Amino acid sequence: MVTSLLIQVLQEPAIIRHFNASDWNLLLRQASSAKMPARLAYHLKAADLINAVPDKILNHINSEQVKVAHLHTQVHQEVQALNQLFNKLDIKAIYLKGTAYLLADLPLAQGRFFSDIDILLNQDEIAKVEIALKCQGWKSQKTDDHDQAYYRNYMHEIPPMQNIMRGTVIDIHHNILPVCNDNIIDISLLSVDALKLDNISTHCQPSYVLTPAAMFLHSAIHLFHEGELEQGLRGLSDLDILLSHFEESETNFSNQLIDLAKKINQQQSLFYAWRYLNKVLKRKLSTTAQAFVGDYQQQAPNLATIDFIFTNLFTAHHSTTASWQFSVAAQLAYWRGHLLRMPLRLLIPHLMKKSWLQLSELTKKEPDKINKVDALDPRFHQLDKE
C-alpha cells in the first residue's frame, strides 16, 4: 500500500510546516483527486495551520471554498421550496447526508461539496411526492424502461429527479439499503426519532434530519456498501469529523452507536467505521469502541480481504498512489459492491440485460460511425475509382 501525502497530512497536519513547493503541489493534486481541497482547508484551520499555507495554494483552496459556499446557498433555497411542497402534502421528509449536515450546521458541512439533495420518505408517500415534483418542473434522469424497473423493484430509491430549469438533482429514498438486500433495514428504527430543525433563519418551514447516532451509522453503511470508492477517503473523513463532533456533544455516543447498530443489525458497518478510522487515519477510539472492535473482529468474515480492499482504496485516487494492490482492490470492491446490492440470482440477469442493451445501442450507432469513417478515408475513394 502506498501511503498518500494527503493521508499523512490528515493524520498529522503539522508536517506541512516542512513542505517545499513540490510537496504542496502534490498535496493539492491529491486533494483535488479525492474531492477534498476545501476539506483540507477545514483540517488546516482546525489545527491552526492555515497561516503556514503558501499564498498560491491558499488562493486555490479559497476558490474551492467559494464554490462550496455558493452551492450551500443554492441548497438552502431548494430546501425552502421543497419544504413548502412537503408542508402542502402533509409529509415529513428527512434530509440525509450532505444536505443534512448543512441544515444541522455541523462542522462537517464546512468545505463539503455534494452533488444532490438526498431525502428519506415513507414508501407509501413516494408516488404522491413524485407527481407533485413533476408538476413543479422535476423529471426523472432515467428514461430507460430497464433502469426504471431496476430502481423501483430492487433499489432503496426511485430514479434521481432533476429540475429542468435549475439542474438541481434530488435522490428520493425509502430505505438506506436496496430492498432486495438480504439484510434489509427497518427504516422506522432510524426515522422515528428524527430531529426537527426549526431555527434556520432562511426557512419558513422546519426541516428534519436523523439523530446523531443514526446519521453516523447511515454514513458508515453507505460508505461500506459502496463498490466504487473514488471518494472513499472523503467518506472516511466525514465519519472522522462526525465522530469528533458527536463525541463532544452527545452523552455516551459510543454506546448510542452500538445500541442502534444492534437494533438495525448493522454491527458490521459500525465495526468497519471504527476499524478503518483507526487503521487509516490513526484516530484514537474510545474505550467502549476499542472493546467493541476487539470483540467483533473475532467473528468478522473475510477480514483479511476486507482489510486489503479498504486499506488500499482509502487514499487519494491519483497516479502517485497507483499500484497493483490498488488495482486488485478496486476490482474486488466493485464486485463486492454489486453482490451487497443484489443477490446473484438477481445480479446476473441484471448485468446480462444491461450488457445486451449497451451492445444493442452500440450496434445502432455503428453503421453511422462506419459511414463517417469511410467518407473521411481517402482509401475508400481510391477503391471506388478503381
Predicted features, each with a name:
Residues M1-S115, L121-E386:
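Conserved NTP-donor binding/palm subdomain of two-metal-ion nucleotidyltransferases/polymerases, i.e.
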